[in-house]
UniProtKB/Swiss-Prot annotation:
Family: Belongs to the universal ribosomal protein uS15 family.
Gene Ontology BP terms: translation
Organism: Rhodospirillum rubrum (strain ATCC 11170 / ATH 1.1.1 / DSM 467 / LMG 4362 / NCIMB 8255 / S1)
PROSITE patterns per UniProt: RIBOSOMAL_S15
Highest taxon of source: Bacteria
Lineage of source species: Bacteria, Pseudomonadati, Pseudomonadota, Alphaproteobacteria, Rhodospirillales
Name of the protein: Small ribosomal subunit protein uS15
Length: 89
């Protein structure tokens, strides 16, 4: 259900804008998307896990805020990111 440290480092390397970049919106959104995907799979089995569902909703909200921020700062980076992650149509 959680992301392994190796997977997290791989995602940081893939989405970082420069060396050592772990806090850029792109990296944060990519990690949140992975966590959201994992939790979505969890809920297919555990439908009544409302405690974790609240955490999922908080993650989705955080990702939305980060995407809104990125869209306001740099639309090109926003469009590239959603294209790479496949989270918008």
């Amino acid at each position: 259900m959680s992301i392994t440290p190796e997977r997290k480092q791989e995602m940081i390397k893939d989405y970082a804008t420069k060396e050592g970049d772990t806090g850029s919106p792109e990296v944060q959104v990519a990690i949140l998307t992975e966590r959201i995907t994992n939790l979505t799979e969890h809920f297919k089995i555990h439908k009544k896990d409302n405690h974790s569902r609240r955490g999922l909703l908080m993650m989705v909200s955080q990702r939305r805020r980060l995407l809104d921020y990125l869209k306001g700062k740099n639309v090109k980076r926003y469009e590239d990111l959603i294209g790479r992650l496949g989270i918008r149509k």
